[in-house]
Amino acid sequence: MTHPSDTGPAPVLALEDISKSFGAVRALRDVSLELFPGEVHALAGENGAGKSTLIKTLAGVHRPDAGQVLLDGRPTVFHGPADARDAGIAVIYQEPTLFPDLSIAENIYMGRRPRRSFGRIDHKATRAATAALMRRLGVELDPERPARGLSIADQQIVEIAKALSFDARVLIMDEPTAALTGSEVARLFGVVRTLREQGAAVLFISHRLEEIFQICQRVTTLRDGALISSEPLDGMTEDDLVRRMVGRDLDELYPKQEVRAGEVAMSVRRLTREGVFTDVSFDVRRGEIVGLAGLVGAGRTEVARAVFGIDRWDAGEVEVEGRRLTNGAPSTAMAAGLALVPEDRRAQGLVMNMSIERNIGLTGLRTTVRAGLVDRGAERSRSLDWAAKLQVKYARIADAVSTLSGGNQQKVVLAKWLATGPRVLIVDEPTRGIDVGTKAEVHRLLSALAADGVAVLMISSDLPEILGMADRVLVMHEGRVTAEIPRSEATEESVMAAATGRAAA
């Protein structure tokens, strides 16, 4: 492996022919990687490709079975994360772990705050050092501000500042934008560019291909634990990268089947929850995919939760197949044929320490319970059937769902609800945090469900997904529906205009 410039700097950190196995599973096979100062390097691959194992090897969590880690060209062994940190390597995860009741400065210098005479903490010096870090990153954050209440984006910036306080030269950013808005992503990318200009090496992991092309100069692609390529992004297209990641050409990423919409399956009228959303009305017809777009905080998820009965509403009504739903009663919604795949699959859609088969079987207990006992045979048969239909990849159906990749966890949530035979399916951010191959599978599934007559309400912050999959687009802004746009007229510009309150319904 060589740097694109023969006269360029030597790699600050490199992996050379790294292999790592867990039992009989080979997570990495002879993988090499070079990270250069002043460069943002993407790590691409589907879930299960080996990205997490590679990151943990760089961070000192895992020791390789074969191969070596090179720091400034010299072989080195990390006996733990502390060794990697002392070597100038830091990992920024998508969910920061700050102490909420401590200030930004206290979080950054936890256990390392400057001392004055007699061992007293020098608060002034701590604040000054924190302010200097923020200036270096080109951001304005008050060092004395508590971490509680910071946005995810600001928390990540604090984590980056903390890494720099340890003189980090290599920053590994693992899905840093997954929970960020467009403006927050832009701000974070500004910080990343500043780091690059200051000579840091950044390893950037994201399922959002457009971000890789926007911020990175090179990309290393893994597939099934093996190195596929490591090359400049100049001249490469998203389709090229997808082929390297999945080993094949994807049939359309948005395989929307044209279906004639049928009768109204779900009707929402003047739904209001004080201080959250107001006077929300819309219909979803059989065979139709309706996209619900809007910025973070617009009220989309809150409407879905109220419609399903998780949260109560103050005014309005919801009907499914002509049957009025009881306010605040999910059991009534389920009995009417409504299913909800929630936004946070780990916290709301799955019981992580429970098996795959039990998770899929949770919604079918009414049919698998006999004389007060669960018929395990019936539950297993049902779970195996749905896992096969959705092509869930697992070792054993009895394994904990926590052992699955994010994409396969999402398939389990979908299987759990599709097993109920829903007439109306609400999916909230159905492809967030999953790889491009699984994303295409989910899109094909939603399209097939609509073709079979299921009414689908799809909430998504991914505009290309909304435009590619929806027959109609509803847009919310500050708790109100501000536009309803047919597929033929929906563009990024028209949706964003309504999402920012610049268009009227």
UniProtKB/Swiss-Prot annotation:
- InterPro entries per record: AAA+_ATPase (IPR003593), ABC_carbohydrate_import_ATPase (IPR050107), ABC_transporter-like_ATP-bd (IPR003439), ABC_transporter-like_CS (IPR017871), P-loop_NTPase (IPR027417)
The GO cellular component terms are: plasma membrane
Question: Nucleotide-binding as a keyword?
Answer: yes
Q: What class of enzyme is it?
A: translocase
List the EC numbers from the record: 7.5.2.7
- Single GO MF descriptor: ABC-type D-ribose transporter activity
PROSITE patterns registered for this protein in UniProt: ABC_TRANSPORTER_1, ABC_TRANSPORTER_2, RBSA
Q: Which residues form the ABC transporter domain?
A: 13-249, 259-503
Q: Where in the cell does this protein reside?
A: Cell membrane
Q: Which UniProt keywords apply?
A: ATP-binding, Cell membrane, Membrane, Nucleotide-binding, Repeat, Sugar transport, Translocase, Transport
**Sorted alphabetically, which SMART domains does this protein's record hold?**
AAA
Q: Where does ATP bind?
A: G45, E46, N47, G48, A49, G50, K51, S52
Under catalytic activity, the entry for this protein gives: D-ribose(out) + ATP + H2O = D-ribose(in) + ADP + phosphate + H(+)
* Top-rank taxon: Bacteria
**Principal location:** membrane
Briefly, what is this protein's role?
Answer: Part of the ABC transporter complex RbsABC involved in ribose import. Responsible for energy coupling to the transport system.
Annotated family: Belongs to the ABC transporter superfamily. Ribose importer (TC 3.A.1.2.1) family.
Q: What is this protein called?
A: Ribose import ATP-binding protein RbsA 2
Q: What is the lineage of its organism?
A: Bacteria, Bacillati, Actinomycetota, Actinomycetes, Kitasatosporales
User: What gene, per UniProt, encodes this protein?
Assistant: rbsA2
